[in-house]
């Protein structure tokens, strides 16, 4: 039965909801009616995941653990550039993770941040810059190997896809926001390059992005990305807010988000994979998701010992900043 937890179902989460509603309403009848209504709504609005065979073509091509170059391999080349894609292929990556953002005139380009300050010789918010302005920036300007990549430009989504396909790399499209724009842009890309249906996936920290993508095209393989405590703490573990009450509110929101991700949102979106920050991944964690028919991909795995552990012991694909050497994580 799909309902049972050990078969990847929803018995555990809905039992929790039922108990919670019993406490709140103090009425078994009302609690049962509300729980049943929530269940019906979830079933009605949820999407079926793509067939697991297709998902495994992307997550474990040739039935092997995949090493995915984060932002194209941001330690080995300027992140989110065509040079990074070429370098990732040269260094033996199975695929690349690429970040999608939009210029002020709606052109989808590769960029992780919402500003251009960190990676380029320019400044300002990407959404305030036209594509013509963005094209003049140097995305290698602040990279440690900038002298080796003197002629790079910020690529469009189409240019990046063309380069990846040329090198037979799988693609993890990481969508930073703009659910409607991103799903429309990606739908156009999948229409133009139909081989992407068996060679790529769309992932995001934002469930609304993944849900919108599934609404737009249910054939696209998708994944939710998650890091526990991401609302209340930065990537290196520091609190985001100095005011106690504000920090406490976001801690509570983190707890709710984490519960929702693991118990409801994965089912609602019909995902095929869950991209989890590596510090929270264990054999039991992989087993839990495997019972749901979902693959776990860990990020960011940046040391030789960690990679060996994922490949030899866990048998789990991972995302890394470097295909060549140990390096610090890029958040």
From Swiss-Prot:
Q: Which family does it belong to?
A: Belongs to the glycerophosphoryl diester phosphodiesterase family.
Q: Which residues lie on this side of the membrane: Cytoplasmic?
A: 1-3, 270-331
How it assembles, according to the record, is:
Interacts with PRAF2. Interacts with RGS16.
- What is the protein named? Glycerophosphodiester phosphodiesterase 1
| Binding-site residues for Mg(2+), renumbered to this chain | 97, 99, 174
Q: Give the main EC class.
A: hydrolase
Q: Could you name the Gene Ontology cellular component terms for this entry?
A: cytoplasmic vesicle membrane; membrane; plasma membrane
Domain of life, per the record? Eukaryota
Tell me the cofactors it needs.
Mg(2+)
Outline the extent of the GP-PDE domain.
65-331
Activity regulation comment: Inhibited by EDTA, calcium chloride, and zinc chloride. Enhanced by magnesium chloride. Glycerophosphodiester phosphodiesterase activity can be modulated by G-protein signaling pathways.
Q: State which residues carry a glycan (glycosylated).
A: 168
> Which reaction is the catalytic activity of this chain?
sn-glycero-3-phospho-1D-myo-inositol + H2O = myo-inositol + sn-glycerol 3-phosphate + H(+); 1-O-(1Z-octadecenyl)-sn-glycero-3-phospho-(N-5Z,8Z,11Z,14Z-eicosatetraenoyl)-ethanolamine + H2O = 1-O-(1Z-octadecenyl)-sn-glycero-3-phosphate + N-(5Z,8Z,11Z,14Z-eicosatetraenoyl)-ethanolamine + H(+); 1-O-(1Z-octadecenyl)-sn-glycero-3-phospho-(N-9Z-octadecenoyl)-ethanolamine + H2O = 1-O-(1Z-octadecenyl)-sn-glycero-3-phosphate + N-(9Z-octadecenoyl) ethanolamine + H(+); 1-O-(1Z-octadecenyl)-sn-glycero-3-phospho-N-hexadecanoyl-ethanolamine + H2O = 1-O-(1Z-octadecenyl)-sn-glycero-3-phosphate + N-hexadecanoylethanolamine + H(+)
Q: Which UniProt keywords apply?
A: Cell membrane, Cytoplasmic vesicle, Glycoprotein, Hydrolase, Lipid metabolism, Magnesium, Membrane, Metal-binding, Transmembrane, Transmembrane helix
Q: Which InterPro entries match?
A: GP_PDE_dom (IPR030395), PLC-like_Pdiesterase_TIM-brl (IPR017946)
Q: What is its EC number?
A: 3.1.4.44, 3.1.4.-
| Lumenal-facing ranges | 25-248
Instruction: Give any Pfam family that matches.
Output: GDPD
Q: Which gene encodes it?
A: Gde1
From which lineage does this chain's organism come? Eukaryota, Metazoa, Chordata, Craniata, Vertebrata
Q: Provide the pH dependence.
A: Optimum pH is 7.4.
Q: Name one GO molecular function term.
A: glycerophosphodiester phosphodiesterase activity
Which Gene3D superfamilies would you find in this protein's record? Answer: Phosphatidylinositol (PI) phosphodiesterase
């Amino acid at each position: 039965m799909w309902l049972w937890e050990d078969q990847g179902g929803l018995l555990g989460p809905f039992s929790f909801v039922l108990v919670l509603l019993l406490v709140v309403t103090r009425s078994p009848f009302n609690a049962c009616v509300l729980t049943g209504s929530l269940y019906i709504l979830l079933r009605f609005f949820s999407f079926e995941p793509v067939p697991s065979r297709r998902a495994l073509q992307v997550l474990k091509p040739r039935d092997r653990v995949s090493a995915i170059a984060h932002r194209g391999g941001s330690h080995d080349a300027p992140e989110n550039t065509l040079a990074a894609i070429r370098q990732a292929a040269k260094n033996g990556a199975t695929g690349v993770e690429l970040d999608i953002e939009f210029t002020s005139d709606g052109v989808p380009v590769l960029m992780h941040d919402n500003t251009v300050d960190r990676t380029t010789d320019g400044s300002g918010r990407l959404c305030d810059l036209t594509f013509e302005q963005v094209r003049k920036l140097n995305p290698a300007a602040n990279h440690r190997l900038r002298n080796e990549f003197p002629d790079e430009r910020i690529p469009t989504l189409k240019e990046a896809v063309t380069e990846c396909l040329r090198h037979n790399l799988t693609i993890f499209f990481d969508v930073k926001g703009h659910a409607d724009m991103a799903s429309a842009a990606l739908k156009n890309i999948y229409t133009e390059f139909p081989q992407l249906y068996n060679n790529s996936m769309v992932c995001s920290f934002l469930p609304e992005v993944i849900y919108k993508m599934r609404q737009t095209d249910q054939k696209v393989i998708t994944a939710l990305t998650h890091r526990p405590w991401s609302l209340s703490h930065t990537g290196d573990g520091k609190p985001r807010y100095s005011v106690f009450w504000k920090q406490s509110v976001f801690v509570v929101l983190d707890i709710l988000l984490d519960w929702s991700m693991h118990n409801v949102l994965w089912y609602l979106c019909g995902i095929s994979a869950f991209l989890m920050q590596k510090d929270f991944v264990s054999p039991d964690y992989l087993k839990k998701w495997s019972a749901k028919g979902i693959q776990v991909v860990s990020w960011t795995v940046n040391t030789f010992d960690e990679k060996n552990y994922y490949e030899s012991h866990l048998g789990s694909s991972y995302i890394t900043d470097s295909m060549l050497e140990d390096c610090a994580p890029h958040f």
